[in-house]
């Protein structure tokens, strides 16, 4: 279905309603039938609410096929239609705390609950609270305890038969257990994919050179609606039961929470993240508690669901045209939204990395107003075909940096401009270069670049570096912008009068910072190396360098071959270290830091060179009792010769040293053809006389 024609203004309600209906139907088709949603949930909800409002104000504009009158979606060709005995309705949505309070008030009024003179409910309603999964709703039919059919929701009245595909989902029992087995039971629930399974699936897709899925919901929907059930069987799908359709041959539980408890006794998977609460306060407490844990959950959710718990009260409240009055879906702030990309700038990172950044028309997404979003690198911009002027989908989840997911291509204006990576750094004018094997372009300005200077100073002061307490980003900004500090060495020249003159920097703060700088002068070699901000050199590598060389000068003058002898230093890291110390400006700054005792550390001798004998780098396993040596003594001798002593035999084992009563390790060595030595043979190797 093509996108709707030009969007009419709100001043033309008839045309606007027709456009909204067409746009929502097109989005429904993409979402339910094609499994290729192209409209963020927040944008769909906004359009849907607008159509509801227009139809409420102009009842004559309501049409029987309006999306407000049904759930959405049509049965796709290739699957047999299934008419639901009981419609699979959607739920009304709430987005703010006020919506939940209003819902509770409507329910209480509908149940004639007692209120005080101010209208506050004094007889709280009992609710069952659950998670709102971001998956695909289905109905499972069991007859006399045996699974016989599964269908998708479809348009709420008619879905698609996906029985064979559902049979492949291990979480769904093919036979119910327990004693209260009904003659017929329609179980309503959600097929979804856990985050870890989604990541593994995309790894397999990449390895096979196949298209990756955008998110777990798309992966679940696409997997479930395969015409070949073998493909579905290869996909890691899961299921949670949360509702009921038809029930025959057993008593309906009195409460919704009781229904879910009963489901568990039948062997159906039910999510444990649920609660029974009372009143609006209980609902909101559950919502905010789940919201705090949302990112740590093993699956995606987009909200929570509230249902009046007592079945008789549900029956009294009944339904409106497309949703039950007794339930509400309380949705989290949308994690994706549409907005316009105004410009693409570039930011310069601490190591000179150039990152394209999208400048956006302000949009509320993920609980915050977003005006900037990362584009990662030049290749990502090209791959996603993102252009200036595009309407784009922006995603912000939790504390993750907002990113541009994709461009909406059929909304692209004729004058949209492609992004061109600048050739000069916007901060210092230095040349920008990109190495052939790297995705990131970098400024070559080193510590001369103001952007890198700020970041380098911030890194230098971090707790795991020189630990300069009180030297935050805002102070660094002022010091650099006022040209008071150009390199880390300048920090130690700062005086009290200079610091108190800074904006919002009191005398006490100035004295504390001076004290911190004084303490930072006495550090360790490992911390100092880490503080320099050498690319690819983290805390662990800095410690290894300090341990291996013992002092700074040998590191600064070490050729690449010597650096490669350091534990866990490979060619890329060695080249990065070598290039850093080869740059004259970096050496000058280091000398300034060391001059006149500004920064000092205890130095030691270099670590003993690694043994180069026949056992160097070999893996040896000890087994049994040796004639004259304890196991520990033999291990020390082997390790001193450069060998690694392992606890089990594998194909990577080079030698097995066996004594009396050697067991399964000896048998495994003989099976794999690994050389087996006695104690005398071990001594021969230790002496360097390989046989």
Swiss-Prot record:
A Pfam family: Nlig-Ia
Span of domain BRCT: 610-691
Database matches in NCBIfam families: dnlj, PRK07956.1
Stated role: DNA ligase that catalyzes the formation of phosphodiester linkages between 5'-phosphoryl and 3'-hydroxyl groups in double-stranded DNA using NAD as a coenzyme and as the energy source for the reaction. It is essential for DNA replication and repair of damaged DNA.
Any GO BP annotation: DNA replication
GO cellular component terms, A-Z: cytosol
UniProt-listed SMART domains: BRCT, HhH1, LIGANc
Co-factor requirement: Mg(2+); Mn(2+)
Protein name: DNA ligase
GO molecular function: DNA binding; DNA ligase (NAD+) activity; metal ion binding
Keyword Electron transport found: no
Key words, A-Z: DNA damage, DNA repair, DNA replication, Ligase, Magnesium, Manganese, Metal-binding, NAD, Zinc
Residues involved in Zn(2+) binding: 425, 428, 443, 449
Residues the record marks as active site: 132
Signal sequence interval, chain numbering: none
Residues the entry annotates as binding NAD(+): 41-45, 90-91, 130, 153, 190, 307, 331
EC number in record: 6.5.1.2
Key word Amino-acid biosynthesis present: no
Similarity comment text for this entry: Belongs to the NAD-dependent DNA ligase family. LigA subfamily.
UniProt catalytic activity: NAD(+) + (deoxyribonucleotide)n-3'-hydroxyl + 5'-phospho-(deoxyribonucleotide)m = (deoxyribonucleotide)n+m + AMP + beta-nicotinamide D-nucleotide
CDD domains reported in the protein's UniProt record: BRCT_DNA_ligase_like, LIGANc
InterPro entries given in the database record: BRCT_dom, BRCT_dom_sf, DisA/LigA_HHH, DNA_ligase, DNA_ligase_AS, DNA_ligase_CS, DNAligase_adenylation, DNAligase_N
EC supergroup of this enzyme: ligase
Gene that this polypeptide is encoded by: ligA
